[in-house]
């Protein structure tokens, strides 16, 4: 029988969300995504410690920031040996509110990849979907540097990314689900509030519909999944980035996967575009408590993991 993973691949580009690249071969994803937390997790495993140690050894007298950039490239180049498509490499979350430094970091990462023999067409630079991050993406895209906009929790963020010409967005599903489930407390009913009614699933569906209605070329890649149900509800989304644990569950399942999203069967189409000037963006984002809280939390978590990675590096000097 055809596995759920193979069925999903008929409708959606499957992406692996991991720094643990030794797991990639068995799932045959097209692309891969990484973030500071995944890289931190990977370098603490015995299989990947040699990459960290070699990178530190080769650049012992350089700044920690310099070494982290080389570590990200080391992981990215290894991942690209195992997949046919693109890898996403994330800009330090501590630059989330600094447009110029985000631009500089994006350019530097691309330069390092190209020096390692990797063309920029295989790289996506990940930036937080803050106003400043979106402005950085707008500049980088015009230079032929493709961007993946992450920590995206709202339609206004998605609309701003599309207007800026971002290559791809990563609207989060699981973290939205977490927020609403926590808010509901004892009133949460998984049978009623999950599946197609999952607030994270509904958010991605709304963004997908908005993009297809107005003809935006920006790719939609659902991210941050908690369950295979969330993934299956978004079959047909342009791309879905999935952790190895959930890829394995899909591979072991023979459940039927039907296409849920298609440009040809859009429902609840929006009547007009979202206003995207800076004041409107900031007000609309502020007006949505979940998106505001989850964006702030996500930046804090990624920034904290960057600091932990710095400490690991400094301990090896």
From Swiss-Prot:
Pathway: Carbohydrate degradation; pentose phosphate pathway; D-glyceraldehyde 3-phosphate and beta-D-fructose 6-phosphate from D-ribose 5-phosphate and D-xylulose 5-phosphate (non-oxidative stage): step 2/3
Pfam families assigned to the protein according to its UniProt record, in alphabetical order: TAL_FSA
Functional description taken from the UniProt entry: Transaldolase is important for the balance of metabolites in the pentose-phosphate pathway.
Residues at the catalytic site: 126 (schiff-base intermediate with substrate)
Catalysis performed (reactions): D-sedoheptulose 7-phosphate + D-glyceraldehyde 3-phosphate = D-erythrose 4-phosphate + beta-D-fructose 6-phosphate
Protein name per Swiss-Prot or TrEMBL: Transaldolase
Record GO terms (molecular function): transaldolase activity
Organism: Burkholderia cenocepacia (strain ATCC BAA-245 / DSM 16553 / LMG 16656 / NCTC 13227 / J2315 / CF5610)
Organism phylogeny: Bacteria, Pseudomonadati, Pseudomonadota, Betaproteobacteria, Burkholderiales
Subcellular localization, as worded in the UniProt entry: Cytoplasm
Domain of life per record: Bacteria
Family: Belongs to the transaldolase family. Type 1 subfamily.
């Amino acid at each position: 029988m055809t596995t759920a993973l193979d069925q999903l691949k008929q409708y959606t580009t499957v992406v692996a969300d991991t720094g643990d690249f030794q797991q990639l071969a068995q799932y045959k994803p097209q692309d891969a995504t990484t973030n500071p937390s995944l890289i931190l997790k990977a370098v603490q495993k015995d299989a990947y410690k040699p990459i960290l140690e070699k990178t530190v050894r080769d650049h012992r007298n350089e700044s920690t920031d310099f070494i982290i950039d080389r570590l990200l490239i080391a992981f990215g180049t290894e991942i690209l040996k195992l997949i046919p498509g693109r890898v996403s490499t994330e800009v330090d979350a501590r630059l989330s509110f600094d447009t110029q430094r985000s631009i500089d970091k994006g350019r530097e990462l691309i330069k390092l990849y190209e020096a390692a023999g990797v063309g920029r067409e295989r790289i996506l630079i990940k930036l937080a979907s803050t106003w400043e991050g979106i402005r950085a993406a707008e500049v980088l895209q015009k230079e032929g540097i493709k961007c993946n906009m992450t920590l995206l929790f709202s339609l206004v963020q998605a609309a701003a990314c599309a207007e800026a010409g971002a290559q791809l967005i990563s609207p989060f599903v699981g973290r939205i689900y977490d927020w609403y489930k926590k808010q509901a407390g004892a009133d949460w009913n998984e049978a009623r509030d999950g599946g197609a009614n999952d607030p994270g699933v509904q958010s991605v569906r709304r963004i997908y519909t908005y993009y297809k209605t107005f003809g935006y070329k920006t790719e939609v890649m659902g991210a941050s999944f908690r369950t295979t149900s969330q993934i299956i509800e978004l079959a047909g989304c342009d791309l879905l980035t999935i952790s190895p644990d959930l890829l394995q569950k899909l591979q072991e399942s023979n459940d039927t996967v039907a296409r849920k999203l298609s440009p040809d069967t859009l429902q609840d189409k929006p009547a007009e575009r979202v206003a995207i000037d800076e004041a409107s963006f900031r007000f609309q984002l502020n007006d949505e408590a979940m998106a505001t809280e989850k964006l702030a939390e996500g930046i804090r978590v990624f920034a904290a993991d960057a600091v932990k990675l710095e400490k690991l590096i400094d301990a090896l000097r």
